[in-house]
A protein has these predicted regions:
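N-terminal lobe of the biotin/lipoate ligase/transferase fold
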Residues: 1-120, 124-131, 201, 244, ...
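Conserved RNA-binding domains used in RNP assembly and mRNA/RNA metabolism
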Residues: 244-292
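Short beta-strand segments
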Residues: 58-60, 84, 136, 152-154, ...
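Conserved, helical-rich catalytic subdomain that frames metal- and/or nucleotide-binding sites
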Residues: 195-255
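Residue-level signal for inorganic ion chemistry
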Residues: 31, 83-85, 111, 140, ...
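Acidic (Asp/Glu) carboxylate-rich active-site/surface patches
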Residues: 103, 107-162, 172
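Short, acidic (Asp/Glu-rich) active-site segment that either coordinates a divalent metal cofactor
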Residues: 160-194
């Protein structure tokens, strides 16, 4: 028999002040799956005046966390940040292929906002002055060239849509995961790179509250002016995109494999990859199965 860790629902006092609703549980299958169920039942915050309402779904432990394409999502109770955020945006924006790829980038950029803002508040500094945070397109968070976490963005339809859809932004970050419990040799944890930091429970609340604030600000601007904000997001991503100029091997959902150099981040949040034959392949966020 496998003994389950005794866990408690996370205390998110700061986050409760920043968000419209917080649903915190001791142990569930996954915050993302729970968020989908809340959406199906219409049990999440909405804002009738056109603002961005945010519902936070958190748990002390998850028994079946899943990321993109149903892949297992590593989460160590008491050491990981793993929270889902529910928002509503106009369906016209969420279904517009010219701009909707940027929603995944917004999740990553908001996560960087939250982490970097929290480190500033704590007075935390990196052990290595060259240590920095980047985003690996389309959904990974990198620290000093190693995977610190990832995001998962998914659109869901509430029962009464009224021209809007719900979007789930799930964010996972290794905060204090010991080296021997990291999921891969290419993974890392925040405490391995910066100090001082508060206890992990407090750190989770600080990051979550800042993530709510950043998501609200970024999404409000995005839904008001999608094309203008897409251009601004593209410029911002160029500064933090870990993949620009690098060689990649991408396994696509359709079964193909593309290998080559990332040469551009495009207006619709896709990337262009130049293969060994000199041809350029355009890849969207929805094309990717696995990328190394």
């Amino acid at each position: 028999m496998i003994a389950l860790y005794k866990v408690a629902a996370p205390r998110l006092d700061r986050t409760a002040k920043a968000a419209d609703e917080v649903a915190a549980y001791e142990r569930i299958d996954s915050t993302h799956a729970k968020a989908r169920r809340l959406i199906e039942r219409g049990r999440f915050a909405r804002n009738d005046d056109g603002g961005i309402a945010i519902t936070v779904v958190a748990a002390g432990a998850m028994d079946d966390a899943r990321g993109r394409l149903g892949r297992p999502w590593a989460c160590v109770p008491g050491h990981s940040f793993a929270i889902s955020f529910i928002v509503t945006i106009p369906e016209s924006v969420a279904t517009d292929d010219a701009v909707n790829g940027w929603m995944s980038m917004i999740a990553g950029l908001a996560t960087l906002d939250a982490i970097e803002g929290t480190l500033d508040e704590c007075g935390a500094v990196p052990f290595n002055p060259e240590c920095g945070f980047h985003l690996k397109w389309p959904n990974d968070i990198y620290c000093h060239g190693l995977k610190l976490g990832s995001t998962f963005t998914q659109v869901a339809s509430p029962p009464d849509r009224h021209g809007d859809v719900a979007v789930i932004f799930s964010v996972g970050v290794n905060l204090s995961v010991p080296a021997d419990r990291l999921p891969t040799p290419e993974s890392t944890s925040l405490r391995m790179h910066v100090a001082p930091l508060p206890p992990t429970a407090e750190l989770i609340d600080m990051i979550a509250a800042r993530l709510v604030a950043s998501l609200r600000t970024r999404l409000k601007a995005f839904v008001q002016m999608p094309l203008i904000q897409s251009s601004r997001l593209r410029s911002e991503m160029h500064h933090v995109c870990w993949m620009m100029g690098r060689q990649i091997d991408a396994q696509l959902i359709d079964g193909r494999t593309i290998a080559g150099k990332v040469v551009s981040l495009n207006d619709d949040a896709s990337i262009s990859v130049r293969t060994a034959s000199g041809e350029t392949e355009r890849l969207s966020t929805g094309d990717i199965g696995l990328m190394v």
